[in-house]
């Protein structure tokens, strides 16, 4: 769910997930279209594509369990869809941390209509 995703992003990046990524560039937050604009935006693009591959669960609402061991996210679900959902969220949180150097505050509230149509998963 969005709750676990936000928690993972905070743990990995140290940033407030809603404030920092809730409307960042073209793909972070709701919606998404066009070419990802930087490495941070590409993390969110890949995450949206990961969600599109899931069947049998609701990425925004369904809760899953994970643990934080030695600064590492460990997904712990028996249900395959919830496990995959956790892995999608884990991947984006790690990607955002690895690309903190590309994060630019000026794109925090980017107008999505400025993102040109294209790039589908």
Swiss-Prot record:
GO cellular component terms, semicolon-separated: extracellular region
SUPFAM superfamilies linked: Phospholipase A2, PLA2
Main location: secreted
Entry-linked PROSITE patterns: PA2_ASP (PS00119), PA2_HIS (PS00118)
Family: Belongs to the phospholipase A2 family. Group II subfamily. K49 sub-subfamily.
PANTHER family assigned to the protein according to its UniProt record, in alphabetical order: PHOSPHOLIPASE A2 FAMILY MEMBER (PTHR11716), PHOSPHOLIPASE A2, MEMBRANE ASSOCIATED (PTHR11716:SF9)
Tissue: Expressed by the venom gland.
Name of the protein described by the UniProt record: Basic phospholipase A2 homolog BaTX
């Amino acid at each position: 769910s969005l709750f676990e995703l936000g928690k993972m992003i905070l743990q990995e990046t140290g940033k407030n997930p809603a404030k920092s990524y809730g409307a960042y560039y073209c793909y972070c937050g709701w919606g998404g279209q066009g070419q990802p604009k930087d490495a941070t935006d590409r993390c969110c693009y890949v995450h949206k594509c990961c969600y599109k591959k899931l069947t049998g669960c609701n990425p925004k609402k369904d809760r899953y369990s994970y643990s934080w061991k030695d600064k590492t996210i460990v997904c712990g679900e028996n249900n395959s869809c919830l496990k995959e959902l956790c892995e999608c969220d884990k991947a984006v949180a790690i990607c955002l941390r690895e690309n903190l150097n590309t994060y630019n505050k000026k794109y925090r509230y980017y107008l999505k209509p400025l993102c040109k149509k294209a790039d589908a998963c």
